[in-house]
Amino acid sequence: VHLTAEEKNAITSLWGKVAIEQTGGEALGRLLIVYPWTSRFFDHFGDLSNAKAVMANPKVLAHGAKVLVAFGDAIKNLDNLKGTFAKLSELHCDKLHVDPENFKLLGNIIVICLAEHFGKEFTIDTQVAWQKLVAGVANALAHKYH
């Protein structure tokens, strides 16, 4: 994905303010609630029967944080997303058999969470940069599927 210097700056400056655990848990929780079929990949997480259970589930919160830590790796390697996510792509493709469309869904939910948390600070230009990033990450994660 091609990011301008301004877009890279918009991503990195906002990222430094992101509450990783809170935002990651919220994003994964929202994915499981808004797109309930995605919960089939998380059967071992215990109670995912309703929104309250999902958002209070410690395994959801922990895995969501892990997902955002991986986004942090992407932000450190904006010019090499495919290389950064090669092993995760292989894991999600070969072992977990995750539908790559789910990466796009989660990316969009991450953008929604950031917009909610940062309000007016999450400008249109910032959204453009983040949408490019989450699309690039989704593409990198789907790389092994091709």
From Swiss-Prot:
Binding site for heme b: 63, 92
PTM-bearing positions, type N-acetylvaline: 1
Segments forming domain Globin: 2-146
Chain positions found as Phosphothreonine: 12
InterPro entries recorded: Globin, Globin-like_sf, Globin/Proto, Hemoglobin_b, Hemoglobin_oxygen_transport
Molecular function per GO: haptoglobin binding; heme binding; metal ion binding; organic acid binding; oxygen binding; oxygen carrier activity; peroxidase activity
Keyword Transcription regulation in annotation: no
Record PTM N6-acetyllysine, positions in chain: 59, 82, 144
PROSITE patterns in alphabetical order: GLOBIN
Signal peptide positions on this chain: none
Keyword S-adenosyl-L-methionine assigned: no
GO cellular component: blood microparticle; haptoglobin-hemoglobin complex; hemoglobin complex
Entry keywords, A to Z: Acetylation, Heme, Iron, Metal-binding, Oxygen transport, Phosphoprotein, S-nitrosylation, Transport
Modified residues (S-nitrosocysteine): 93
Gene Ontology biological-process annotations: hydrogen peroxide catabolic process
Tissue specificity as recorded in UniProt: Red blood cells.
Assigned protein family: Belongs to the globin family.
Role, per record: Involved in oxygen transport from the lung to the various peripheral tissues.
Assembly mode: Heterotetramer of two alpha chains and two beta chains.
This protein's name: Hemoglobin subunit beta
